[in-house]
Amino acid sequence: MLNQNLHLNYLSGNSVFQRVLCLRRNLVKIIATLGPSSSSGSVIAQMARVGADIFRINMSHGDQRSWESMVSAVVEAESMVERDLGLVADLEGPRLRIGDIEPVRVQPGSTIVFSYSGGDVTIPHREFFEVLGEGDIVLIGDGKVSLIVESVEGLTAKLKVLQGDLIESRKGVVVSGKEPELPTLTAKDKMCLEYVARRPFSHVMVSYARSSEQIELVRSILRDYGRQDVKVLAKIETPSGVRRVKEIAQVADGIVVARGDLGMHYSLEDIPVIQRDIVKVARTQYKPVILATEFLSSMIEKPAPSRSEVVDIYEAVRISVDALLLTGETAIGRYPVKTVQWMSRVIVKAQQGLNVDRPPAVAQIYRLARGLVELAENLNAILVIYSKTGRFAERIASFRPTKPYYVGVPSEKVARALRILWASEPVVVGDTSYEEGLVRTSRLLEEKGVLGPGDTVVEAAWSSEKGVYLVRVRNMVV
């Protein structure tokens, strides 16, 4: 991994600077979930080479031992591909789940008993029975099993199966149209945050985000551990999250549209509209936005996607989101590398002729960011910036450059965090002044052949502490 000695050696003319730049093709980033199919360093490296920039560990599954193995594999893959990779911890969150049971396959028309303890299916949550009423629809897993409540007596309920499948331990349970009062963070979530603070995670996803206070609590815990650099992403997947998405977006570092869980609460035909509205909220608040789940579900078993899946990815790119999240396709699927490769192919195709929608720029720093993006486009120039914290890069990404832009950063922590942003390509050049940071970044890009004779370069930096903006245009001499 890159260290300060390498920075110094590079600046003194030594060629030992080993970080290889990724000459990016896809502007929309790909997040791949790790699991049994993709937990080795070699597979992660292959996924990174064909288009994945960020890797997600779902903390609903496994334990610290299995997570540690995946973290180590990502670090190993970084060495193989010679670039920093984003690493996301997805908290399990407060969710109703089935207890430990023997798997039971249910058939339509049959009846089954849910109980707080015992019964055919154990639901170890009093909150579930407190909101349950006759006629309620209960969904299990991703909605593969649906039931209607026939009667409720205390902590026991009798339900009739509408749609049958296998019911297993730890599957999520949703009462359609109702949200039980659950804790903001579970004890497991807090344990996970302590683990995250000790490892090289760049982002945390807060599952079932319902309020701004929930996001602030996660941020304060990370701050107490000295990890204020970790970006906090709010997953919108419940009706309360949808209702409060504006206030949540104001405090979160990014928004995740969890379409799978939203489909448990809303009619499926409503999901595209909800998705569009959430994306619009995030974009107008200059926050990164990610679409999640079921993009290439058929590739869990098959080596190529369906036509409708290709169209889904295409349309997601056309609304200019920052990243797309693969879940089971790469975690448990038979073709994790091919899945990433297919998603990257569709993204690149969808970008052709894309007319990006740019939000209005109100504050001065946003006007500067938009102006830089448009200046680079008008000059057909390559945009190069230096950012100590990554905030300037986030603002640039908000205005959707139509080709990659390069961000000189002081550390690998900042580089990993920026991987999730639209079109960004972070380059670690060390902690220095803004002027020197730009010099180092452009010099490195020249050495790697990204910048060359005949190129026009727009260079920029912004110091929030000093209130100083630095902008210059250079024509590379032939």
List where the protein language model places each region.
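Non-catalytic helical/linker scaffolds that mediate oligomerization, partner binding
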Residues: 5-478
